[in-house]
A protein has these predicted regions:
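Residues within the DNA-recognition helix of helix-turn-helix
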Residues: 59
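N-terminal helix-turn-helix DNA-binding core of bacterial DNA-binding proteins
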Residues: 9-55, 79-82
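Hydrophobic alpha-helical core bundles mediating ligand binding, dimerization, or RNAP-core interactions
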Residues: 15, 96-103, 107
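HhH-family (HhH-GPD) DNA N-glycosylase catalytic core used in base-excision repair
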Residues: 1-10, 17-19, 107-111
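Basic, amphipathic "hinge/linker" alpha-helix immediately C-terminal to the N-terminal HTH DNA-binding motif
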Residues: 75-99
């Protein structure tokens, strides 16, 4: 279960709070890649590309702690770990969609 975020330590501005939670480049890509559904660590690493294993692990742990990502460990040999978005993580879809649309429009205007 994700640890409760200390709301008092977050910025007063809601937009800044959102940026605090997802502003890292890798976090946005993790959200993008988990929107369609559950993925294993290796699948995430492959789909994101140039992120190191250490950084991806740290980002996933941070997102899990903030309640955006659910990590499920299966007692198998070899061990299997799957990541999925929580309801809170999925609630970021409209924000990611808006970022996607804005990026498409920006590229079209500057082509």
């Amino acid at each position: 279960m994700a640890a409760k975020v200390d709301v008092k330590s977050l910025p007063a501005c809601p937009a800044e709070t959102t940026l605090t939670l997802i502003s890292d480049k890798w976090k946005v890509l993790i959200l993008r890649d988990l929107m369609p559904g559950t993925k294993r660590f290796g699948e995430l690493k492959k789909s994101i590309g140039s992120v190191s294993q250490k950084v991806l692990t740290a980002q996933l742990r941070d997102m899990e702690q903030n309640g955006l990502v659910h990590r499920e460990v299966f007692a198998e040999v070899p061990p299997r770990v799957e990541y999925s978005l929580t309801e809170l993580g999925r609630s970021l879809k409209p924000i990611l969609d808006a970022m996607w649309n804005w990026g498409e429009e920006f590229k079209a205007r500057n082509a």
